[in-house]
Amino acid sequence: METPKLSVEAIEKGTVIDHIPAGRGLTILRQFKLLHYGNAVTVGFNLPSKTQGSKDIIKIKGVCLDDKAADRLALFAPEAVVNTIDNFKVVQKRHLNLPDEIAEVFRCPNTNCAGHGEPVKSRFYVKKHNGQTRLKCHYCEKTYSRDSVAEA
């Protein structure tokens, strides 16, 4: 019997973000500044997946994401699973929930908004509309696509 082969090396302790839609791994690395922890980060792109066809995966050695950070990931990869690893074993498996509100992560794309350039904490209300994630700014009350806000 053939031993299963891992496409991406296992980690002893840290976080694995699995079942990221193929092509979104790099966006998550950038948006969540996962390279700034100073720890080893392993990324797999377009790996085979039984449920998705192909997927991306991110492994961060020595870093455990809290529930708030994990739920922020739902904006970019709602079907992703965040696994906490200890001694090479999954000790916690979290399925993501889209948060109702997100603060201090994105800047409002509206250049006339207080949330764009003023020293205030950005705040958006998160809604699903026709299968799309939409964010409504607390200050200017304009609604934007997730990608518009992420690029601002």
UniProtKB/Swiss-Prot annotation:
Keywords: Metal-binding, Pyrimidine biosynthesis, Zinc. GO terms for molecular function: metal ion binding. GO terms for biological process: 'de novo' pyrimidine nucleobase biosynthetic process; pyrimidine nucleotide biosynthetic process. Coiled coil: none annotated. Belongs to the PyrI family. HAMAP family: Asp_carb_tr_reg. This is Aspartate carbamoyltransferase regulatory chain.
